[in-house]
Amino acid sequence: MLSPKRTKFRKQHRGRMKGIASKGNTIAFGQFALQAQDCGWVTARQIEASRRAMTRYVKRGGKIWIRIFPDKPVTMRPAETRMGSGKGNPEFWVAVVKPGRILFEMGGEEITEEIAKEAMRLAQYKLPVKTKFISSDKIVGGDSPVEKAIEKESTEEVKK
């Protein structure tokens, strides 16, 4: 199970999940990825279950990258405890996921789009957030201004 080796503080506030992911929202390592569509907490157990499902389907061919890490402790009080007497002890770890965040990436010579899509579909069932399959050959965020300028220059050269 994934968890930090050490943290500065044992307990954290629950926090708010608003906005979209500004970091970790592009494919960096593989050709295919699983991208979050809404926000939520993904536990270390859910990450491990998803990883196992994908690894089992691809039969250890190719490579899988986990792009999220559970670094937030979630505390719980013992059952039937009276109110007060402080905050509970950390029980498990979660990764805070915002829309647009890449959760898993997959790549390799043996991995085709069909294999990756099916493996990611199996992983989707293990996760509490809505996700979608994306591949690196399709531009995720639309055309950037730089790409539009390059395309415009190339079409002008063809016309001359």
UniProtKB/Swiss-Prot annotation:
CDD domains, A to Z: Ribosomal_L16_L10e
- State any single GO MF term: rRNA binding
SUPFAM superfamilies listed in its UniProt record: Ribosomal protein L16p/L10e
The Gene Ontology CC terms held by the record are:
ribonucleoprotein complex; ribosome
Alphabetically sorted, this entry's keywords are: Ribonucleoprotein, Ribosomal protein, RNA-binding, rRNA-binding, tRNA-binding
Q: Which GO terms describe its biological process?
A: translation
Lineage: superkingdom: Bacteria
Q: InterPro entries per the record? A: Ribosomal_uL16, Ribosomal_uL16_bact-type, Ribosomal_uL16_CS, Ribosomal_uL16_dom, Ribosomal_uL16_sf
Provide an example Pfam family for this protein: Ribosomal_L16
Tell me the function of this protein.
Answer: Binds 23S rRNA and is also seen to make contacts with the A and possibly P site tRNAs.
Give the record's family classification.
Belongs to the universal ribosomal protein uL16 family.
This protein's assembly is summarised as: Part of the 50S ribosomal subunit.
Q: What is this protein called?
A: Large ribosomal subunit protein uL16
Originating organism? Prochlorococcus marinus (strain MIT 9515)
